């Protein structure tokens, strides 16, 4: 069995980054991946402006007198255009263009307005005080977004602020999804003896949609090798990646491995993790392939740990980060046999001492999916580790946005 780290390294080294691109209006580019470095065409701000409501002043005037007349007003979008006489200030609002010659802006709370309309300043401001300088946020020619960045509710408004109307992106990844097994029934149909609902395909589709993939649903395939091969050949014609659920363990009716050897190549099909040992990765003639285990928890764990980064690579999402890991104290004993990296469902929180404390949630069988609902992390127990006693330190992996 291949350790998870080696499996992930092998997979990411083999998977290509996209080369095709398309150009979209920014209002249609949410959750897409930026396909080029984006350079600012302007300075932001494009002019010196006031950071406060107050008075624009020249320090030379204040050095002669701390009381000045008011020459006029400047508003955002309506700059002061009058004559700025000596020994006067300009009333200015936040965002308004700084009048030519101003050295500082004094906030209105530090100014006394006199009965005759003049204003008295309580202290001499510093040079440049409360002035936002041209290019202070973004300079003309700055790279504001790197290739491989996710376009979202933070990055797209930045492009809008620069007047950038369109952006080059990578195409959405096309992913074919299918389940295998005579025992599977679509959700909504009554169950007969020995049947179960096909939750894995539903789960995978939800995860793919959250990753902004274009999902091609090939449904449920019976345990029939000829139909399975036909579906594989059709799926690879339409998709960049084919994902199956079930059919990768060592069973008489598990055809995935055999078909993959026939129409493509298997790179690995067993990894040293629990749950999720029977995970397959390979290459069809025209598409890549990931085979998830049939047990629901195993399918979700392997998707999270392996398929998620694979999709990031194929999508061009080079800024994707692996899930964060933290140290925590376990509040209960944990059962663990050495030999495989173990991902147990857990719930973590801060205890009264301000420490991160974690406990397992529910039974940890690979077929027991309900424990995920009350979990917010994986408890990651090292491959060589055995049973864990309450009070010991363990590694946890808080769920990222994919599972929240």
Where do the protein language model's features map onto the residues?
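Short, low-complexity N-terminal leaders and the immediately following helix N-cap/first helix
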Residues: 1-64, 68, 312, 317-345
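Flexible glycine/proline-rich
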Residues: 22-27, 77, 138, 261-404
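Short, glycine/charged-enriched hinge/interface segments at domain edges or termini
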Residues: 2, 15, 23, 55-217, ...
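Solvent-exposed alpha-helices and their adjacent loops that cap or buttress functional pockets
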Residues: 48-50, 61-63, 81-85, 98-100, ...
């Amino acid at each position: 069995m291949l350790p998870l780290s080696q499996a992930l390294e092998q997979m990411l080294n083999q998977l290509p980054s996209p080369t095709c691109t398309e150009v979209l209006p920014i209002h249609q580019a949410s959750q897409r991946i930026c396909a080029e470095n984006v350079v600012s065409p302007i300075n932001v701000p494009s002019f010196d402006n006031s950071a406060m409501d107050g008075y624009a002043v020249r320090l030379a005037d204040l050095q002669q007198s701390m009381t000045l007349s008011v020459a006029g007003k400047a508003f955002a979008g309506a700059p002061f255009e009058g004559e700025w006489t000596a020994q006067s200030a300009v009333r200015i609002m936040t965002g308004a263009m700084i009048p030519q010659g101003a050295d500082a802006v004094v906030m209105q709370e530090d100014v006394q307005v006199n009965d005759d309309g003049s204003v008295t300043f309580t202290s001499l401001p510093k040079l440049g005080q409360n002035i936002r300088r041209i290019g202070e946020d973004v300079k003309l020619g700055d790279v504001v977004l790197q290739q491989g960045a996710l376009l979202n509710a933070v990055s797209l408004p930045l492009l809008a602020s620069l007047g950038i109307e369109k952006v080059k992106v990578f195409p959405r990844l096309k992913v074919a999804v299918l389940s295998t097994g005579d025992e599977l029934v679509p959700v909504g149909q009554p169950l007969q003896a020995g049947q179960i609902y096909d939750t894995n395909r539903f789960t995978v589709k939800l995860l793919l949609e959250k990753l902004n993939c274009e999902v091609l649903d090939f449904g449920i395939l019976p345990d029939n090798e000829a139909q399975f091969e036909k579906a594989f050949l059709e799926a690879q014609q339409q998709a960049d990646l084919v994902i199956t659920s079930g059919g990768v363990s060592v069973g008489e009716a598990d055809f995935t491995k055999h078909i993959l050897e026939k129409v493509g190549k298997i790179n690995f099909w067993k990894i040293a993790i629990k749950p999720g040992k029977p995970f397959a990765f390979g290459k069809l003639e025209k598409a890549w392939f990931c085979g998830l285990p049939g047990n629901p928890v195993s399918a979700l764990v392997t998707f999270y740990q392996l398929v998620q980064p694979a999709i990031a690579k194929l999508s061009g999402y080079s800024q994707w980060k692996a899930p964060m890991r933290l140290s925590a104290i376990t509040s209960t004993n944990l059962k663990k046999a050495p030999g495989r990296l173990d991902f147990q469902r857990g719930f973590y929180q801060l205890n009264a001492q301000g420490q991160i404390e974690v406990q397992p949630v529910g039974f940890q069988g690979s077929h027991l999916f309900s424990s995920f609902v009350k979990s917010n992390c994986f408890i990651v127990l090292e491959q060589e580790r055995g049973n864990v006693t309450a009070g010991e330190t363990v590694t946890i992996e808080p769920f990222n946005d994919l599972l929240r």
